[in-house]
Regions:
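Aromatic (Trp/Tyr) and acidic
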Residues: 271-347, 353, 365-424, 428-429, ...
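Bacterial N-terminal signal peptides
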Residues: 8-18
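Catalytic domains of cell-wall/extracellular-matrix polysaccharide-remodeling enzymes
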Residues: 82-85, 107-220, 224-259
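Active-site beta->alpha N-cap acidic-glycine motif
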Residues: 23-118, 131-149, 240-243
Length: 835
């Protein structure tokens, strides 16, 4: 029996060598009037998928396209479009911005196999078949004006079909021959079967042998091949995209490839929006943007709102000169939606109540992954020998139990500087939502997947508290750091840490005493001046723990112990005002905190709430005046963690303890910082008010939190839209179209600078990465590089972001940044709320 589709494929392979090719004004290659290749001037490929009876590869294909920030073109028959089992897949094709076009209604053969010039249907029959196909496409919300290209059934046509397609307002396209990709449908028992490996290698061979590589290719694959083929090419699709991406190719829709028009991009919050809050997306392009946009219901694909874009004037981003805000705040109906602006669509998102309620618990997964000691994510223990002392009252090298706590980021160091803040912020997140059901109990105290009757956020905070108590072994003693940058000795899992700090490979690690003096075991000394920064945050965490557990019969003794430790360490801070910075050893990079009055204010305010002792209230007011509005806000450059924490929680916690006059002063401090950020945000089209320094995402979370706290303090809603823009930046409304949290949203950081995920080939949910940095910072840092080509190159501007494991400046998750985002989202649950 003759396999006519295989004969057709061979025909095209032979024809490519002899066809009479014509080139139109934009450099396309034609055969018999149909386009078989786009312009070869750029490294762009149109990935073309056809479907009629099967679709088992569809989900994998769409997932891989999403992973590569790529778009494809899908040509489906009417029978495919009306198959209820395929409807979710088709809706996903549309909602994720891919091209959806016709492939005939019934998959009939239009031209004779042996004599292709012989047409097997009349023009009337062709038109009826095509019209039915187009009608079924429109049922998925695709406007007829957006359907411009037609790929014929069996990829077989003649001049009549080309002409009749044009009469129907469509341009006929077919695959570029020469790669054997179209053979991916053949069954295992077919005598002309081509394995997925051979197809894969054939594509790469053609890329090497063609003078233009695969530039302009229409690379055809089938969305499904049915049960007759077990060697599914979809399983190799991601590998193919990886290989071609590494060679510099971009994957675009067929209309973008052939029309050579600058694309439009739409960026929105990929998680979603509250019913009553501002809802503003951003569209951008190299050229003038469409005047209007529409909001489309992702379930029905019906337009529910149409609006006009508001041009953002006098600002640009990178190569993009045209930006517009797409405001759909009037939509207050719950559902799942996406935005369409011209040919572009956003990633889908939700509108509804409590949109952010699941996120704090999601972010806790990363906190558990960062645990030192017993790590539930790895299911094993690490660093049991932490540690041996340096500086302080004990002989250097004296054993001190500093096990537990959290690894700070992608490395394995542990800092009280960041951990104290993370612990306090998680406790405050719970305290502010004391009666909320949104904090769930999925794990036990060790982080294992079994309940223990305590919300997971308190389990995680308790993990931090237990470690902090170990760092305060006596009333006059406080330790602040375990390990140093000798840790940066190659990639390994925490239990396999081989670093030698002087007590043998993989042995005890150094534990630094907080003496308030410059420290550093080699040439790089810190600029420490005191311990008040550490002490204030320590006291805040311990006093919050007491407030939460003092009436809990099972934990009241622990609460009392925390309060006593908080008082003792607060006294150390009072006696030694100033900052204890992080210590480095081999390089100049360290935590360079210079502020401390804000921390003492917070600690004093929480101690007053815990004890009612007037001295603490007096101290809090004094430190509040000293801290004032000093922060990074409004600055273009600062030292690393110079103004830490990145917002002063102390003003918020003191606010309802003071008289009206002092309340105005505290609110004014917050307002001053926010206004400086608004001014900075006016210089970019996304209204982002933070400097793009190291950990800009942490700054952004802090800014959102300050706006939310200001509103809770005063009832003043003036900053709500500005705060929403900052939050939305973290959730996808940015040039790169990615959230800054792993596994949150449709597109998120995947190749993060984190040893545990890279070495285990697993992903972790909820990690906040550092976020974009100024291009000049990226280029100045030692040891920072990326793999080329950069898939996000088109979207880089004055600030750059790389989803690349080698870029620790923008794509390294931080434990404390993630904890601060937990507080941010906890406030969002009740935002807008009452005081």
């Amino acid at each position: 029996m003759v396999n006519y589709r295989f004969v057709a494929a061979l025909f095209w392979l032979l024809m490519i060598a002899t066809l009479s090719a014509a080139t139109n004004g934009i450099g396309c290659l034609f055969s018999n009037g149909g386009i078989i290749r786009g312009p070869v001037t750029e490294k762009k490929i149109a990935l073309v998928f056809t479907g009629h009876s099967f679709a088992e590869g569809g989900a994998t294909i769409l997932d891989e396209l999403k992973r590569h920030h790529a778009h494809g073109s899908f040509f489906f028959t009417g029978d495919f479009l009306t198959n209820a089992a395929f409807a979710p897949l088709i809706r996903r094709v549309v909602s994720e911005g891919h091209y959806l076009g016709p492939h005939s209604d019934k998959h009939v053969l239009y031209a004779d196999w042996d004599k292709p010039e012989k047409t097997l249907v009349t023009q009337k029959e062709f038109r009826r078949d095509l019209t039915a196909n187009l009608k079924k496409i429109s049922a998925f919300g695709v406007a007829r004006s957006d359907v411009k290209y037609f790929l014929p059934p069996f990829e077989w046509f003649n001049a009549d079909i080309v002409r009749w397609s044009a009469d129907a307002g469509l341009t006929l396209v077919n695959f570029t021959p020469g790669t054997r990709s179209n053979a991916d449908y053949m069954g295992d028992d077919d005598k002309n079967f081509v394995s997925s490996e051979k197809i894969f290698q054939s594509i790469l061979t053609r890329e090497q042998s063609d003078p233009h590589g695969l530039n302009g290719f229409l690379l055809l694959l089938h969305i499904g091949s049915g049960p007759a083929r077990t060697d599914k090419f979809a399983a190799r699709f991601g590998e193919l995209l990886d290989a071609l991406t590494a060679k510099g190719y971009e994957f675009v829709r067929v209309d973008e490839l052939l029309e050579q028009r600058p694309p439009v991009f739409v960026r929105a919050n990929q998680v979603g929006y509250g019913l009553q809050e501002p809802k503003v997306a951003v569209a951008f392009s190299h050229v003038a943007l469409p005047e209007s946009f529409s909001l489309v219901d992702a379930a029905t694909l019906k337009t529910v709102f149409t609006g006009r874009g508001q041009a953002i004037l006098n600002v640009t981003w990178g190569q993009f000169t045209n930006h517009a805000e797409l405001d759909f705040s009037k939509v207050k109906r719950a559902g799942n939606y996406f935005i369409r602006c011209g040919d572009a669509v956003s990633w889908p998102f939700a509108i509804g109540e409590n949109i952010y309620a699941p996120l704090p618990d999601a972010l806790l997964e990363f906190m558990r992954e960062q645990r030192c000691g017993y790590n539930p994510w790895l299911g094993t223990n690490c660093h049991p020998a932490d540690g041996r002392t340096a500086y302080g009252p004990l002989t250097n090298g004296t054993p001190l139990d500093a096990s537990g706590g959290w690894h700070d980021a992608g490395d394995l160091l542990k800092y009280l500087l960041t951990s104290g803040n993370a612990t306090a912020q998680m406790l405050l997140a719970y305290k502010l939502n004391l009666h909320s059901t949104n904090f769930n109990d999925h794990t036990d105290a060790l982080g294992n997947a079994t309940t223990n009757g305590l919300p997971d956020i308190l389990d995680e905070a308790r993990w931090g508290l237990d470690w902090m108590l170990k760092l305060h072994p006596a009333p006059e003693q406080l330790y602040h750091q375990v390990a140093d940058d000798r840790d940066h000795a190659g990639w390994r899992l925490p239990p396999d840490d081989p670093v030698d700090y002087g007590w043998g490979k993989g042995g005890a690690r150094v534990v630094y005493f907080a003496d308030g003096q410059p420290q550093g075991l080699r040439k790089y000394l810190s600029a420490s001046t005191g311990v008040a920064n550490l002490a204030g945050r320590y006291a805040a965490a311990m006093a919050l723990a007491y407030q939460i557990w003092r009436d809990d019969p099972q934990r009241k003794e622990f609460a009392a112990r925390c309060l006593q430790a908080g008082k003792e360490v607060y006294a150390l801070g009072r006696a030694k005002p100033g900052v204890q910075q992080g210590n480095s050893c081999l390089s100049p990079y360290r935590y360079e905190e210079t502020t401390w009055a804000d921390d003492m204010e917070w600690g004093a305010a929480e101690l007053f709430r815990a004890t009612g002792e007037k001295q603490f209230l007096d101290d809090a007011k004094r430190f509040a005046a000293l801290a004032a509005d000093e922060s990074w806000m409004g600055k273009e450059q600062t030292g690393h963690y110079q103004f830490y924490p990145f917002m002063n929680v102390g003003h918020f916690r003191l606010y309802d303890l003071v008289d009206d006059g002092f309340k105005k002063v505290l609110a004014g401090f917050y307002r001053s910082g926010i206004e400086r950020c608004i001014a900075a945000g006016g210089k970019n089209p996304y209204r982002i008010g933070v400097p793009f320094i190291w950990c800009s995402a942490n700054l952004t979370a802090a800014l959102v939190t300050q706006c939310a706290m200001y509103e809770r303090m005063t009832g003043d809603t003036r900053y709500r839209e500005f705060a929403a823009a900052q939050r939305d930046w973290l959730l996808g409304r940015n040039p790169w179209g990615t959230t800054m949290f792993t596994e949150i949203g449709s597109v998120f950081p995947r190749d993060v600078h984190l040893m545990t995920t890279q070495l285990t080939k697993r992903s972790v949910r909820g990690a906040l990465v550092d976020g974009p940095v100024y291009d000049r910072i990226f280029k100045s840092l030692k040891g920072v590089t990326i793999r080329e080509p950069d898939p996000l190159a088109a979207f880089q501007g004055a600030a750059v972001y790389h989803d690349d494991m080698h870029d620790y400046s923008s794509n390294e998750p931080t434990m404390d940044g993630t904890a601060s985002a937990i507080l941010m989202f906890a406030l969002e649950k009740t935002f807008p709320g009452t005081r």
